[in-house]
Swiss-Prot record:
GO terms for biological process, alphabetical: cytoplasmic translational termination
GO molecular function, one term: ribosomal large subunit binding
CDD domains: RRF
Role played: Responsible for the release of ribosomes from messenger RNA at the termination of protein biosynthesis. May increase the efficiency of translation by recycling ribosomes from one round of translation to another.
Pfam families in the cross-refs: RRF
One GO term describing the cellular component: cytosol
Similarity comment text for this entry: Belongs to the RRF family.
Amino-acid biosynthesis recorded as keyword: no
Domain of life of the source: Bacteria
Location in the cell: Cytoplasm
Protein name (record): Ribosome-recycling factor
This protein's UniProt keywords: Cytoplasm, Protein biosynthesis
Length: 187
């Protein structure tokens, strides 16, 4: 019973990568109090590539509803400001020299609904990533079976295992989304 070069654990690890990315993105959708992690997902167009904000500035929380972004390179202030505005976090930057202040607005019902939509978008991106991994795995299984490196029975059994892993990770994504949606909508 040979399974060729097929590693189900590697496929599961890649699927979990999508879940980890989703957790990171959902962590940026904060409600209520200011947190430096709110701006973690912000990518800045800098030095010819996209860079995370935390590689260009120091983010601090001087007050419960205020973030302070100290940009290290004066020439990057406008790029950081633009990235924050474009990030769909609903934050309006106020710049003073190399410091960008971000007031965290009280969340009204409309803004909560916008945040839920953003969370749904992130979750759908994660689901699509998981489905791509599933497709890669199933394609690999078909090739192994076609090249007689695996029996048809083994291919079908492993395809079922791939589907079970996919269903499990998609279910985890749905649970993460439901928890974040509840957190956002709780007044």
């Amino acid at each position: 019973m040979s399974t060729g070069n097929f590693d189900l654990n590697e496929l599961k690890r890649r699927m979990q990568g999508a879940t980890q990315a989703l957790k990171h993105e959902l962590g940026g959708l904060r409600t209520g109090r200011a947190s430096a992690s709110m701006v973690e997902p912000v990518q800045v167009e800098a030095y010819g590539s996209h860079m995370p904000l935390n590689q260009l500035a120091t983010v601090s929380v001087p007050e419960p509803r205020l973030l302070s972004v100290q940009v290290w390179d004066r020439s990057m202030v406008k790029a950081v400001e633009k990235a924050i505005v474009d990030s769909n976090l609903g934050l309006s930057p106020a710049t003073e020299g190399q410091v960008i202040r971000l007031r965290i607005p009280e969340l009204n019902q409309e803004r909560r609904k916008e945040l839920v939509k953003v969370a749904h978008k992130y979750a759908e991106q994660a689901r699509v990533a998981v489905r791509h991994v599933r497709r890669d795995g199933l394609d690999t299984l078909k090739k192994l079976e076609k090249n007689h490196e695996m029996s048809e029975d083994d291919q079908e059994r492993l395809a079922g295992d791939v589907q079970k892993a996919t269903d499990s990770v998609i279910s985890e994504i749905d649970q993460l989304l439901a928890a974040k949606e509840k957190e956002i909508l709780t007044v």
